[in-house]
């Protein structure tokens, strides 16, 4: 019987499952190397942790690792129901809150090694977390994609730690009771982007679609479709970072000015940015809550030991 120790949290409604122990040791000098080792040689552990019968499509996993840089608190590898994620904003906030719950870190600044580079997070005395994300930028403005059943859809392509297609004009109500229509539109758009060869830099696949609408209590409300056809319950940290990059590129948000981003559930992140050459450095503040501590058991006699 194999055992995997976990602690679960949610950030603005979006869950994170932090794996503390039980996964195989991963070789590699960088977090990208370790992610590749997990993906290529031990992917069944991701499936066992996140897929049914132990998990669900909406779960995001975070594997706690020893850091690869001397001044980092830890390393982390993010993954979901279909594969691996370079960076995860809500997951980093959940990671920090979970480590604090376990007594492993105190309020203050902490560096985290990720597969796309180091990020910094500040745990505040009130329990909120400010993430200093990887540099973000808009790659392409007003790209057009033909989406079957919806016609021409216009959006910006931006990097915020993952690749996003950001759509302001879509004709849909961005409300929780309209998730089915939002999901169908977003998935169709994501598929059309791939089929028509519309990508991020260096041919990178755009694996997130972000839709926007007005919100009475925030600067904007979004709906984010993630890889694996699961929508983000939070305002999405990397998605908010991509939005900040587009706002900065359009001259609509000044350096240091706050942007309040609401998600589909009504939860909110507060963001701002600093300029770094051709990029911006996003800062995202949110809060996570611990929901469970558990030991997952993997019985190799179980036909669904490694997920369904």
From Swiss-Prot:
Answer yes or no on keyword Kinase. no
Protein residues bound to substrate? 89-90, 208, 232, 237-238
Keywords attached to this Swiss-Prot or TrEMBL record, sorted alphabetically, are: Isomerase
Q: What is the reaction catalyzed?
A: trans-4-hydroxy-L-proline = cis-4-hydroxy-D-proline
| Active site annotation, chain numbering | 88 (proton acceptor), 236 (proton donor)
Entry EC no(s): 5.1.1.8
State any single GO MF term. Answer: 4-hydroxyproline epimerase activity
The chain's disulfide connectivity reads none
**Key word Oxidoreductase present in the record?**
no
Tell me the InterPro entries matching this sequence: Pro_racemase_fam
Membrane-crossing residue ranges in chain numbering? none
Q: What class of enzyme is it?
A: isomerase
Job description of the protein: Catalyzes the epimerization of trans-4-hydroxy-L-proline (t4LHyp) to cis-4-hydroxy-D-proline (c4DHyp). Is likely involved in a degradation pathway that converts t4LHyp to alpha-ketoglutarate. Can also catalyze the epimerization of trans-3-hydroxy-L-proline (t3LHyp) to cis-3-hydroxy-D-proline (c3DHyp), albeit with 19-fold lower efficiency. Displays no proline racemase activity.
Its family remark reads: Belongs to the proline racemase family.
What the entry lists under NCBIfam families is as follows:
PRK13970.1
Q: What is this protein called?
A: 4-hydroxyproline 2-epimerase
The organism encoding this protein is: Chromobacterium violaceum (strain ATCC 12472 / DSM 30191 / JCM 1249 / CCUG 213 / NBRC 12614 / NCIMB 9131 / NCTC 9757 / MK)
What are the leading ranks of the lineage?
Answer: Bacteria, Pseudomonadati, Pseudomonadota, Betaproteobacteria, Neisseriales
């Amino acid at each position: 019987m194999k055992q995997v120790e976990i602690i679960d949290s949610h950030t603005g409604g979006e869950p994170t499952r932090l794996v503390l122990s039980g996964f195989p040791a991963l070789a590699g000098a960088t977090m990208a190397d370790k992610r590749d080792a997990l993906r290529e040689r031990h992917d069944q552990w991701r499936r066992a942790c996140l897929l049914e019968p132990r998990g669900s499509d909406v779960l995001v996993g975070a594997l706690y690792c020893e850091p690869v840089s001397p001044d980092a608190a830890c390393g982390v590898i993010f993954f979901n129901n279909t594969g691996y994620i370079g960076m995860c904003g809500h997951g980093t906030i959940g990671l920090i809150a979970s480590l604090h719950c376990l007594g492993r870190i105190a309020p203050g600044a902490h560096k985290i090694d990720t597969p796309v580079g180091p990020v910094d997070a500040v745990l505040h005395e009130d329990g909120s977390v400010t993430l200093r994300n990887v540099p973000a930028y808009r790659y392409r403005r007003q790209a057009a994609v033909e989406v079957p059943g919806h016609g021409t859809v216009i959006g910006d392509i931006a990097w915020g730690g993952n690749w996003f297609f950001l759509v302001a004009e879509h004709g849909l109500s961005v409300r929780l009771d309209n998730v089915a229509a939002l999901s169908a539109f977003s998935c169709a758009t994501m598929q059309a982007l791939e089929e028509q060869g519309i990508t991020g830099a260096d041919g990178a696949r755009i694996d997130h679609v972000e839709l926007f609408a007005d919100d009475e209590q925030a600067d904007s409300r979004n709906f984010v479709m993630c890889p694996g056809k699961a929508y983000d319950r939070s305002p999405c940290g990397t998605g908010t970072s991509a939005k900040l990059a587009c706002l900065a590129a359009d001259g609509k948000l000044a350096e240091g000015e706050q942007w309040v981003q609401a998600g589909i559930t009504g939860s909110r992140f507060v963001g701002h940015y600093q300029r770094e050459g051709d990029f911006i450095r996003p800062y995202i503040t949110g809060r996570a809550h611990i929901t469970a501590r558990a030991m997952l058991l993997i019985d190799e006699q179980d036909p669904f030991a490694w997920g369904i």
